[in-house]
Amino acid sequence: MKENFSIMFIHSIFLILIIFIYSNETIAQVTDDENCETLQSEVHITKDEYDEIGRLKRTCSGDISVTKCEGFCNSQVQPSVASTTGFSKECYCCRESYLKERHITLHHCYDADGIKLMNEENGVMEIKIREPVECKCIKCGDISQ
């Protein structure tokens, strides 16, 4: 009777251990998904231009489509005897891994009095922007990339 109880007890512990391991693997699979991607976004840009003595010469604006990084990355905090805080942190952020320069033309230009500029020379403004070409999960605070 005592041996049967011991065998049943061992089988029960073994079954609980298997369920625990399976549950942890399932949780790891669910939280292991990263979703960091490059998406299109519409933004409104306004740029002021000043003369040599600092007076407003013209203001130009426009709505343009640009790329942006959006999504989430895996991060974790776990107990650590090596760390002074008692925890080891690994944080990752969805950021640009490569930027490209792009020339944009703003078509709505106004002088300092708010009058729309129509001539070819002042009616448009060329500006340069930098936008992400590729996004990925990068260690948070790492500005080298």
UniProtKB/Swiss-Prot annotation:
Q: How does it assemble?
A: Heterodimer of burs and pburs.
* Function statement: Final heterodimeric neurohormone released at the end of the molting cycle, involved in the sclerotization (tanning) of the insect cuticle, melanization and wing spreading.
Record-annotated disulphide pairs: 36-94, 60-109, 69-135, 73-137, 91-140
Known InterPro entries for this protein? Bursicon_suB, Cystine-knot_cytokine
Is Cell cycle among the key words of this record?
no
Subcellular localization, as worded in the UniProt entry: Secreted
Q: What is the lineage of its organism?
A: Eukaryota, Metazoa, Ecdysozoa, Arthropoda, Hexapoda
User: Which PANTHER family has this protein been placed in?
Assistant: PARTNER OF BURSICON (PTHR41151:SF1)
The GO terms describing molecular function are: G protein-coupled receptor binding; neuropeptide hormone activity
Please provide the Gene Ontology terms (biological process) for this protein: G protein-coupled receptor signaling pathway
Region forming the signal peptide:
1-28
Q: Does the keyword Lyase apply?
A: no
The protein's name in its UniProt record: Partner of bursicon
Name the UniProt key words of this record, in alphabetical order.
Disulfide bond, Hormone, Secreted, Signal
**Gene Ontology cellular component terms for the protein in this record:** bursicon neuropeptide hormone complex
Q: Which gene encodes it?
A: pburs
Domain CTCK: start-end pairs: 36-131
